[in-house]
Amino acid sequence: MAKDISRRSFLKALGGGAVASSALLAACKSDKQDTAKQQEPEKGKMTYRVNPGTKDRVSLLGYGMMRLPDKNAGKDPSTGTGEIEIDQEMVNRQVDYAIEHGVNYFDTSPAYCQGKSERATGIALSRHKRSEYFIATKMSNFSPDTWKREASIEMFENSLKELQVDYIDYLLLHSIGQGQDALGMFNSRYMDNGILDWLVEQKKKGRIRNLGFSYHGDVKIYDMLLKWHDEGRYHWDFVQIELNYLDWNYANEINDRNTCTGRAGAGAWLPLDIRPWCPAVLWYSPWGGWS
């Protein structure tokens, strides 16, 4: 592996969105002994969290594959097609560097990088042992032409193909709560077509190891899915939310729904305290660009 990527340049890429600062608070158990086991390591070493369901030892820093090195970046847009041309060699080098330094959680989606992220991610990761990394990808069926059952199934199968794997470690319903009619969109994407039940079946078959969702938007949908879990209707292994470090103190200045004031469950992080089953993946660059 090329050794000419410095820590400075790697973190610079992080600031540009190529790498997402994340925290996988697996299980979020309140047991003090479990917490003690996950204390900070010695300086310069990666911190890990243990998923109690699968016993995955997941790095506290994850790699977001939403914005990858683009050979066309910086070119005059009027002279090009506007399409991304991923610099696969650079992606490989950055992924190698990340794994070498303890990162083992890689988050992608069929929608990222104009649909090219999963393939680039698969190429980079396939050069490593499957046991060295965890892949998170999503059911990103945003467009109405992907709401049909067959189209959504094809999207999942294509993710496996592009990522060059036969199972997904962490599969998410992508960005629930979007749109003017958030409930209607959720039903169209996952319920009316039976795709959520189909994904549950894929988990039983071992093709999905952890099933969860990422949340952006209407908190009512977020609360609804947590209620389903409590009622035993569906089991969520993890939840992924966007959270900038500034949100801890200033989220209410942006939107009161971001805070834990008013009622339990309203805040992005409060459910982690009251629902110890639920790990969270926090994908927000420290510089503000989210992946």
Please describe what each predicted stretch is:
Residues 2-133, 198, 204:
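N-terminal binding-site loop/beta-alpha segment at the start of enzyme catalytic domains
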Residues 48, 95, 118, 122, ...:
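Generic structural signal for well-ordered alpha-helices
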Residues 58-62, 105, 132-136, 167-170, ...:
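Structural preference for beta-strand elements that scaffold enzyme active sites
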Residues 85-97, 148-162, 220-227:
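Short, acidic/polar
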Residues 128, 132-149, 174-177:
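Structural motif corresponding to the early beta-alpha repeats
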Residues 151-171, 201-205:
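CE4/NodB-like, metal-dependent polysaccharide N-deacetylase domain
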Residues 176-291:
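Beta/alpha (TIM)-barrel catalytic core signal, keyed to glycine-rich beta->alpha loops juxtaposed to Asp/Glu
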